[in-house]
Amino acid sequence: MTIKPSDSVSWFQVLQRGQHYMKTWPADKRLAPVFPENRVTVVTRFGIRFMPPLAIFTLTWQIALGGQLGPAIATALFACGLPLQGLWWLGKRAITPLPPTLLQWFHEVRHKLSEAGQAVAPIEPIPTYQSLADLLKRAFKQLDKTFLDDL
């Protein structure tokens, strides 16, 4: 079992890291077969946008029609909790260390950036998925679109 470097992260920091990871991860279709981040990001953004209004609508509808308050509150809390689950998953994923296969791929992309004359930041002692997202975002901006084909 791998030891995560940030086990002492609070739940609020995990949600913040999830939001940052969601903004950082490049939304490229070629990454979708390998990484679930594209799907989780799309669903989480959808949930952030539409679940709070749905929760309010459900709550007011149940109250206006004389329904019971308990199930209405439970449904509203469930609807508001869905985007939080996505942010939680993304936050936990962001602080997870890269497995050995992705670590090799991380170093190859980093090497391609340095070969292209781009300054690269020093490597963390244990690279995480967040550092991979930062690197991929930068590679998509500064390298040609075929850099993934060579890897």
UniProtKB/Swiss-Prot annotation:
It is a multi-pass membrane protein. It comes from the Bacteria. Keywords: Cell inner membrane, Cell membrane, Membrane, Transmembrane, Transmembrane helix. Signal peptide: none annotated. Its main location: membrane. Belongs to the UPF0208 family. This is UPF0208 membrane protein YpsIP31758_1444.
